[in-house]
């Protein structure tokens, strides 16, 4: 499986916290900003599909 | 800082727990990361009118936008079924005011309340959970508490940090997107729901009126869908020629619609509301369930503190599963069966429902209605349709 880094489009994101809720690895924290913890992420892409507005995308990273 | 109880999250569940525990004379701190409790909201704001009595909440016009008398559902080909009472059956709230007032009632009952305070971790000493670590305007604060309540909504980080398993696969969430907008031509005394696999996969489109011509217009779809909720809502509005030039507010959010949490308590931490996935799996409404669970939890917190026996907290899990569990499991089964409906099935059901005594159905006395439907040839000939109805019995 490819290793990814999740990217947020801050102009689209509503900071609703939904992606943090579906993430099985607690790799996202949503407070007054959207934060990603790459070391925790298991590259499952669940958050990307779940975002109601499509604010998330990804880029591949070298393993 | 030391309290008997710290409640994380001041949505619907949190303030009810805080209020009821404070009323019993124990010290409570209620925190929320939002600078203004209730804002922004993630909700269509519809709720049954009975909750005010059941949970001792004032029927205060400051947070009631509109009284509702029933519902109308629409099938993909345009069949409708309507349920209208002569008495008020539900209300469309103003959540921003409602949530803040719930926190106000908690404060009045004796709880301390702190907005703009984000819990970032648990406070552990010698392996035991002693409270929470929080951030308030950039400052780190340690809050000691005998009991920690995770009422932090769909994100559910606090419970997970404590080791409570609130995980469920993405299919057990709905993704939701909503406009508060000017919309005309829909009876403002009813809520309106549209079903169909092309319209809203797994979920529905809703119009919840807040005024004659102003409504929450939103959608929920399965969160593992390739397309976004926004995509489907915009498509529906366009196909129905509904102008989108007067948008007052946009809301987005996720709703847990299944995968209930088995163990709601671990040591001195309890999880409640959306964080515990206590949401009606069929319609995605979570406010009632959040209040109901908060009510049960508060009762056991008070008992545990009175008798200085934290083991008693576990009775919250037991009582929730006894009181709410069976209903929720049944609704989940129904939701899973409904997911298999084709558009043609939906047409048939809505058509048949349109010709039945819907009041009986809504009153919970749906046994007869379902039985009658099961005898209809269009249902009898379809295994899938029969299965759906069987799930209801
Ligand atoms: C678009 C949409 C429409 C909906 N429509 C309806 C409806 O019409 N009727 C209905 O009954 N339900 C509806 N729901 C569901 C309903 O909104 C929730 O079920 C309900 O709000 C759950 O209440 P809660 O108290 O558990 O969580 P929430 O109301 O989500 O409250 C959780 C609170 O915790 C705070 N928080 C989170 N993490 C932290 C932290 N680390 N530190 C401090 N604070 C934190 C958040 O800021 C938030 O205020 C809808 C949901 C969505 C997304
Ligand atoms: S789900 Fe989407 S809108 Fe919500 S916080 Fe995550 S990225 Fe932002
Ligand atoms: S890809 Fe998976 S693990 Fe990584 S942040 Fe998204 S949901 Fe979490």
Swiss-Prot record, chain B:
Pathway where this protein functions: Membrane lipid metabolism; glycerophospholipid metabolism
Catalysed reactions listed for this entry: a 2,3-bis-O-phytanyl-sn-glycerol 1-phospholipid + 8 A = a 2,3-bis-O-(geranylgeranyl)-sn-glycerol 1-phospholipid + 8 AH2; 2,3-bis-O-(phytanyl)-sn-glycerol 1-phosphate + 8 A = 2,3-bis-O-(geranylgeranyl)-sn-glycerol 1-phosphate + 8 AH2; CDP-2,3-bis-O-(geranylgeranyl)-sn-glycerol + 8 AH2 = CDP-2,3-bis-O-(phytanyl)-sn-glycerol + 8 A; archaetidylserine + 8 AH2 = 2,3-bis-O-phytanyl-sn-glycero-3-phospho-L-serine + 8 A
Binding site for FAD: 13, 32, 43-44, 46, 95, 119, 274, 286
Cofactor note: Binds 1 FAD per subunit.
Binding annotation for a 2,3-bis-O-(geranylgeranyl)-sn-glycerol 1-phospholipid: 327, 363
Pfam families: FAD_oxidored, GGR_cat
Assigned EC number: 1.3.-.-
Record keywords, A-Z: FAD, Flavoprotein, Lipid biosynthesis, Lipid metabolism, Oxidoreductase, Phospholipid biosynthesis, Phospholipid metabolism
Protein's UniProt keywords contain Oxidoreductase: yes
One annotated Gene Ontology cellular component of this protein: membrane
Sample GO molecular function, one term: flavin adenine dinucleotide binding
UniProt keyword Repeat present: no
BP GO terms, sorted: glycerophospholipid biosynthetic process; membrane lipid biosynthetic process
Coiled coil region boundaries: none
InterPro entries named among the record's database cross-references: DGGGPL_reductase, FAD/NAD-bd_sf, Geranylgeranyl_Rdtase_fam, Geranylgeranyl_reductase, GGR_cat
Function in brief: Is involved in the reduction of 2,3-digeranylgeranylglycerophospholipids (unsaturated archaeols) into 2,3-diphytanylglycerophospholipids (saturated archaeols) in the biosynthesis of archaeal membrane lipids. Catalyzes the formation of archaetidic acid (2,3-di-O-phytanyl-sn-glyceryl phosphate) from 2,3-di-O-geranylgeranylglyceryl phosphate (DGGGP) via the hydrogenation of each double bond of the isoprenoid chains.
Additional observations: Reduction reaction proceeds via syn addition of hydrogen for double bonds.
Similarity comment text for this entry: Belongs to the geranylgeranyl reductase family. DGGGPL reductase subfamily.
Full protein name: Digeranylgeranylglycerophospholipid reductase
Species whose genome carries this gene: Pyrococcus furiosus (strain ATCC 43587 / DSM 3638 / JCM 8422 / Vc1)
């Amino acid at each position: 499986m490819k290793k990814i880094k999740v990217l947020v489009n801050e102009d689209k994101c509503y900071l609703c916290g939904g992606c943090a809720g579906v993430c099985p690895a607690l790799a996202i924290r949503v407070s007054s900003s959207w934060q990603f913890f790459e070391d925790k992420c298991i590259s499952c892409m669940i958050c990307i599909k779940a975002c109601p507005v499509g604010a998330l995308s990804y880029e591949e990273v070298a393993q | 800082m030391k309290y008997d109880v710290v409640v994380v999250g001041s949505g619907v569940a949190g303030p009810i727990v805080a209020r009821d525990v404070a009323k019993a004379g124990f010290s409570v701190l209620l925190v929320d990361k939002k600078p203004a409790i209730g804002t922004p909201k993630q909700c269509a704001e519809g709720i049954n009118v009975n909750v005010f009595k059941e949970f001792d909440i004032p029927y205060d016009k400051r947070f009631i936008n509109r009284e509702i008398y029933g519902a109308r559902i629409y099938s993909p080909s345009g069949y409708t079924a309507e349920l209208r009472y002569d008495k008020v059956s539900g209300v469309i709230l103003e959540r921003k005011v409602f949530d803040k007032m719930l926190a106000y009632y908690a404060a009045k009952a004796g709880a301390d309340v702190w907005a703009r305070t984000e819990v970032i971790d648990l406070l552990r000493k010698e392996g035991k959970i002693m409270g929470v670590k929080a951030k308030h305007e950039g400052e780190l604060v340690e809050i000691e508490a005998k009991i920690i309540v995770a009422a932090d909504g769909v994100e559910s980080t606090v419970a997970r940090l404590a080791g409570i398993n609130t995980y469920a696969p993405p299919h057990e969430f709905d993704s939701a997107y909503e406009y508060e907008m000017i919309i005309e031509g829909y009876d403002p005394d009813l809520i309106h729901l549209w079903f169909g696999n092309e319209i809203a996969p797994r979920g529905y489109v809703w119009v919840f009126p807040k005024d004659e011509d102003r409504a929450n217009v939103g959608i929920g779809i399965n969160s593992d869908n390739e397309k976004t909720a926004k995509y489907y809502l915009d498509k529906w509005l366009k196909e129905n020629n509904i102008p989108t030039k007067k948008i007052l507010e946009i809301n987005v959010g996720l709703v847990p619609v299944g995968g209930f949490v088995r163990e709601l308590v671990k040591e001195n931490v309890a999880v409640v509301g959306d964080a515990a996935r206590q949401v009606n799996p069929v319609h995605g409404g979570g406010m009632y369930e959040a209040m109901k669970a908060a009510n049960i939890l508060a009762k056991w917190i008070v008992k545990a503190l009175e008798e200085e026996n934290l083991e008693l907290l576990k009775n919250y899990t037991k009582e929730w599963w006894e009181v709410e569990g069976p209903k929720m499991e049944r609704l989940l089964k129904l939701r899973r069966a409904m997911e298999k409906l084709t558009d043609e099935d939906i047409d048939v059901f809505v058509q048949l429902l349109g010709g039945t005594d819907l009041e009986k159905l809504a009153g919970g006395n749906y046994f007869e209605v379902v039985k009658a439907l099961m005898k209809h040839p269009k249902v009898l000939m379809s295994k899938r349709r029969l299965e759906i109805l069987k799930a209801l019995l």
